[in-house]
Amino acid sequence: MFKQTFKVNIIPTQPFEGQKPGTSGLRKKVTEVMKTNYLGNFVQSIFNALPEDKLKGSTIVVGGDGRYYNNDAIQLIFQIAAANGVGKILVGRYGLLSTPAISAIVRARSALGAIILTASHNPGGPNGDFGIKYNMSNGGPAPESITNAIYKHTTSITQIKTTRNVSVDNLGLLKTYEWNDGEFVIEVIDSADDYVSLLKTIFDFDGIRKFVKNHPNFTFNFDAMSGVTGAYGKRIFTDELGIPESCLINCNPSQDFNGGHPDPNLTYAPLLVKKMNNGEFDMGCASDGDGDRNMILGKRFFLNPSDSVAVIASNYKAIPYFNKGGLKGLARSMPTSAALERVATDLKVPFFEVPTGWKFFGNLMDAGTLSICGEESFGTGSDHIREKDGIWAIICWLQILTHHNQSTNDKNFVSIEEIVKQHWAKYGRNYYSRYDYEEIDTAPAEAMMKHVSQQIESKQLIGKKFTGISDSLEYEIASCDDFEYKDPIDSSVSSHQGLRIIFTDGSRIIYRLSGTGSTGATVRVYFDKYETQPTQLNNDVQTHLKSLIHIALVEISKLNHYTGRNEPNVIT
């Protein structure tokens, strides 16, 4: 125990424009965040938005994904937290904590909340992005009532409470530091301990280890994409599950993610995708910068995130946590394919369709009505925490493989592809794809969305028929709207969550304008087509969706006309 003292200092400041946190907190360029008082203003505004009686003497968890400026920001948070009456900071070793691990720690240690330093899957480095968000005592993202309060304080802030006498020189040491006779404490904790303990209550680690041992030819590859889960990879996959350390790549967290884009998809994880397409591994997986997203691949087989959550749900009995406690309900974000809904119907459990944003799942979980959920954007999770969880999803699939291969050997091994195709044979297949058009100037992006919105508002699309350019099928629009969600728990209403066009055969086209990047806008277009014919379940996705894609991009939105873009940056 290192005992020291500090005094509170008041620093005058002025508001910065644009400090409005979104679904994933505040994300800005590093160069902007490093401006004098910029980050200090936002951190002080977080504390100003919290009830003073709850803040005083409270425990706050702090950590991040290790991107550039992470540890400088942590030292700043220490100083402002101490001056604002926080009693204890739990900080991850080296300043590293995955977002799922933070959620687990908050819940396990009854913390008031957490300050998470991450821009998730956005690039890092001196010219990259930086992010900060506040999570609540349930371990989940702050609701709009809190984020709006934070923003309001950023617009009127005049001073920052801080101190010059609080710092931890070496975050690599697992030690406890004390100031003012215990009035303020910083404890550097192991980044993985609480999280691994939780995972052991969910999965049969011994069973998975036995599966790995009994199938010596089973090959596995995990790509941490130089993000925070590199700090967890060896501990979980090698030490706990018996997978050779040589199967882990890019597991050294890097301030700029080793020059990469830590977004686990087919575009930004090219090395892993190439290896899997070459058939080098039975299972390949990747996680993003802060560890909440996942991509899973089988040998020469891409597992769509929408299918992944559906298969996990349909195999819930293979996972001890759900086999023991049962399924309370299933949910997906609106743009995610309808595959999960068919599982919910079959299992006779409640189903929820919510806007994009994990906080909507959190409300349902806190009310005890939701167990498993997912987003098409490579986010999958359950009620074990209140964030999506990339490592959890990967272990789910290891557990499912273990279940399906209890009596197999290397000759009759049941693969990821076979498990998914068994699922399609039972439930049908949702052919699904998402096109991302990134860093578009805001004005043309908004003009395109307005063009689609006007067609929806006028009802002129309802009953309109299109002939498929590739399949000659007739596509008739049954309904269209701007998705609105009324939360069944707190009755809050979330409007303008995405433009939906639904066809008579159940096919869907969805348009969304996203602002999670630090520059420009991203237009996302989603295509979802349901197929039950046995002879049509194994087609190429882009070929099968060609007609629907043409209708969406050319006939309805005229995307090229408005944005000048001929091709998306990312196809999922």
From Swiss-Prot:
Mg(2+) binds at S120, D288, D290, D292. Its cofactor is Mg(2+). It comes from the Eukaryota. One of its GO terms (molecular function) is phosphoglucomutase activity. Pfam families: PGM1_C_vert_fung, PGM_PMM_I, PGM_PMM_II, PGM_PMM_III. Substrate binds at T23, R27, S120, H121, K133, D292, R293, T356, E375, E376, S377, K388, R524. It catalyses: alpha-D-glucose 1-phosphate = alpha-D-glucose 6-phosphate. Keywords: Carbohydrate metabolism, Cytoplasm, Glucose metabolism, Isomerase, Magnesium, Metal-binding, Phosphoprotein. InterPro entries: A-D-PHexomutase_a/b/a-I (IPR005844), A-D-PHexomutase_a/b/a-I/II/III (IPR016055), A-D-PHexomutase_a/b/a-II (IPR005845), A-D-PHexomutase_a/b/a-III (IPR005846), A-D-PHexomutase_C_sf (IPR036900), A-D-PHexomutase_CS (IPR016066), Alpha-D-phosphohexomutase_SF (IPR005841), PGM (IPR045244). GO terms for cellular component: cytosol. The active site is at S120. Binds 1 Mg(2+) ion per subunit. Its main location: cytoplasm. It is found in: Cytoplasm. Its EC number is 5.4.2.2. It is an enzyme of class 5 (isomerase). This enzyme participates in both the breakdown and synthesis of glucose. PANTHER family: PHOSPHOGLUCOMUTASE (PTHR22573:SF2), PHOSPHOHEXOMUTASE FAMILY MEMBER (PTHR22573). Belongs to the phosphohexose mutase family. This is Phosphoglucomutase-1.
